[in-house]
Amino acid sequence: MLDLEQLRPFFASGVWQRIAAARQVLREEPFITALPAGEVVPEAAGRGKGAKGPGLVQGIADVVLVFDDHAEILDYKTDKSRNATYYIESYAAQLRLYRRAFALRLPVPVTKLTIYSFAMQDEIDIPLEYAAFGIGDKLLGR
């Protein structure tokens, strides 16, 4: 449960300013997308034609901000960790799949992936090279 003191920094943050400035704000946006199995499970890449077959990705994005020329995906986290590296290592693969799924649905590119940590009371940008399709897991040693 979040208390008011945990919410104050959020409403003073750049994240909140971007939410207010977006042309469209999609909240709790469900999606289901068929992707090549090698993108869904990187370990399957290169393992015959099964790795090229479809794998379903289903989820709910906390917030998708749509601007005139780009989109951003925002994921809220209530984990207790106060270490940005923890969030990047734990959630880059998830946001990589979200980015891929929404790239197929939106008329503009997804150019920013952000986690807002209520424990840290701060936003953490996921470097796009970590979230590149099929690259993030290699960078993280997975």
Regions found by a protein language model. Give the residues of each.
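Structural signature of nuclease core domains in nucleic-acid processing machines
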Residues: 1-142
